[in-house]
């Protein structure tokens, strides 16, 4: 359950659905968890209700979970920090967190379960960490096919802890492990981050397809060809094919493309059915739709490396208002034939 049977004190930064779910899991299996929300009013509501009524209604907070809005108080005397803030806030929170931590202790364990790219720079999150904290910092990326509601309820779950430092990867795997939660380890940080971000784009694509009632054949084709695109993109950035075929790649892709708990898939469904601008649909969903930010970042990177990523291109065109879902389908089907196994 814990590192050498010793409970840890863990700060979870970000009290949305995913951060709350991970905090609930960690505290339920014996760790002391301090969940941070940057908004004092939200933090007070969470602490008084003892559950996240907005995102995880009916799942009570364990006694070992406390909610804070003061970052310095949250980080006091912790063994480890898990960041689960939106990608656009990642750098700012990282800077503040590290400044506080370095004032109190020389070493701490760092991981994040945020998926996506930094919107302003199109950088992957590990690149931000290396820019801000140095190339030698140890960290882990936690990713895989997961829905917050199911993790919070204690349903069986498997994820990946990726780090170039095997001990760091194992630290987080051990911290999460219990009878209902299995965390595998590996070293391909780039591949794990790409899988976690790219699958959100494909979830939007399958949502658009299903919103147009194009059928199960079309959905399966999008998932299969989306997998090829993800591998092609990963090749350009140094990811391993084996990673793309694992939990953080194929596993997460299938989950988010086929279940309506995925807000990216729901976004695609609503966009196709309503024919409204993307911004209006995002506002109605009321949560961050990471795939919208991811597709803009991937488009910039794809243009830089001259990558052929046709599904991504059409999702991008729809989101920025350059095409409709119906037009995008026609463009994809008009493409010249090619070998199915041509990844480059």
UniProtKB/Swiss-Prot annotation:
**Gene Ontology MF annotations:** glycerol-3-phosphate dehydrogenase [NAD(P)+] activity; NAD binding
Entry keyword Oxidoreductase: yes
Q: Which GO terms describe its biological process?
A: carbohydrate metabolic process; glycerol-3-phosphate biosynthetic process; glycerol-3-phosphate catabolic process; glycerophospholipid biosynthetic process
**Catalysis: reaction(s):** sn-glycerol 3-phosphate + NAD(+) = dihydroxyacetone phosphate + NADH + H(+); sn-glycerol 3-phosphate + NADP(+) = dihydroxyacetone phosphate + NADPH + H(+)
Enzyme Commission number, as recorded: 1.1.1.94
Task: Cite the entry's keywords alphabetically.
Answer: Cytoplasm, Lipid biosynthesis, Lipid metabolism, NAD, NADP, Nucleotide-binding, Oxidoreductase, Phospholipid biosynthesis, Phospholipid metabolism
Catalytic EC class: oxidoreductase
Residues noted as binding sn-glycerol 3-phosphate in the record, renumbered to the chain = 115, 144, 146, 199, 252, 262-264
Mention any one GO cellular component term assigned to this protein in its UniProt record: cytosol
Xref: PROSITE patterns = NAD_G3PDH
Subcellular localization, as worded in the UniProt entry? Cytoplasm
**UniProt-annotated binding residues for NADPH:** 18, 38, 115, 148, 263, 288, 290
Per the record, the pathway is: Membrane lipid metabolism; glycerophospholipid metabolism
Name which cysteines form disulfide bonds: none
Main localization of the protein described in the UniProt heading:
cytoplasm
What family does the Swiss-Prot or TrEMBL record give for this protein? Belongs to the NAD-dependent glycerol-3-phosphate dehydrogenase family.
What does the UniProt record say this protein does? Catalyzes the reduction of the glycolytic intermediate dihydroxyacetone phosphate (DHAP) to sn-glycerol 3-phosphate (G3P), the key precursor for phospholipid synthesis.
- Any idea what this protein is called? Glycerol-3-phosphate dehydrogenase [NAD(P)+]
């Amino acid at each position: 359950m814990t590192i050498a049977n010793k409970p840890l004190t863990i700060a979870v930064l970000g009290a949305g659905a995913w951060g709350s779910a991970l905090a609930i899991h960690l505290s339920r299996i014996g760790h002391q968890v301090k969940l941070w929300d940057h908004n004092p009013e939200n933090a007070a509501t969470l602490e008084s209700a003892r559950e996240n009524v907005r995102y995880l209604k009916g799942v009570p907070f364990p006694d070992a979970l406390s909610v804070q809005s003061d970052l310095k108080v949250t980080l006091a005397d912790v063994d480890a920090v898990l960041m689960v803030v939106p990608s656009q806030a990642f750098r700012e929170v990282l800077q503040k967190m590290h400044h506080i931590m370095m004032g109190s202790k020389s070493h701490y364990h760092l991981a994040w379960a945020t998926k996506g790219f930094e919107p302003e720079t199109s950088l992957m999150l590990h690149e931000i960490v290396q820019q801000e904290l140095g190339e030698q910092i140890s960290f882990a990326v936690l990713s895989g096919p997961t829905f917050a509601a199911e993790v919070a309820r204690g349903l069986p779950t498997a994820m990946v802890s990726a780090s170039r430092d095997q001990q760091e990867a194992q630290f987080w795997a051990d911290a999460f492990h219990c009878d209902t939660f299995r965390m595998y380890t590996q070293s391909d940080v780039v591949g794990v981050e790409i899988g976690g971000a790219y699958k959100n784009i494909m979830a939007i694509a399958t949502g658009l397809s299903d919103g147009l009632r194009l059928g199960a054949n079309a959905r399966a084709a999008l998932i299969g060809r989306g997998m090829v695109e993800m591998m092609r993109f990963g090749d350009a950035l140094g990811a391993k094919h084996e990673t793309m075929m694992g939990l953080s790649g194929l596993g997460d892709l299938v989950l988010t493309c086929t279940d309506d708990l995925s807000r990216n898939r729901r976004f695609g469904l609503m966009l196709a059915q309503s024919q409204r601008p993307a911004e209006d649909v995002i506002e109605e969903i009321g949560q961050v739709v990471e795939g919208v930010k991811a597709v803009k970042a991937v488009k910039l990177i794809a243009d830089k490396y001259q990558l052929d990523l046709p599904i991504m291109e059409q999702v991008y065109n729809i989101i920025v208002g350059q095409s409709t879902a119906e037009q995008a389908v026609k463009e994809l089907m008009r493409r010249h034939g090619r070998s199915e196994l041509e990844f480059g």
